[in-house]
């Protein structure tokens, strides 16, 4: 019998790849607040669809807004800190899938 986690990943691989591809295609150059915020909105949609959670938004004037997602409850917490702006200028980052990768 296949591990339930591995089974889930195998069953949903195409959906996850499509979400990842869509995220990469949301260009978010650091200096372009509007594009970074659009990428943030896409992330908010992903979190809402897959985890049923909405972020706390910390509006910024020059850079993209900061987002805080709280998932789960309890005394033991894990912090995942990341950014979603990119160092690439607009239209400089290409994506491709070859042989399913």
Predicted regions and their residues:
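Acidic/His- and Gly-rich active-site-bordering loop/insert found
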Residues: 2-101
């Amino acid at each position: 019998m296949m591990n339930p986690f591995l089974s889930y990943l195998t069953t949903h691989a195409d959906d996850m790849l499509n979400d990842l591809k869509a995220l990469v295609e949301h260009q978010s150059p650091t200096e372009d607040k509007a594009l970074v915020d659009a990428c943030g909105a896409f992330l908010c949609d992903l979190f809402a669809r897959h985890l049923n959670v909405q972020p706390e938004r910390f509006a910024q004037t020059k850079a993209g807004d900061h987002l805080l997602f709280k998932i789960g409850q309890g005394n033991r917490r894990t912090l995942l800190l990341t950014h979603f702006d990119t160092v690439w200028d607009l239209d400089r980052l290409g994506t491709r899938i070859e042989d399913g990768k």
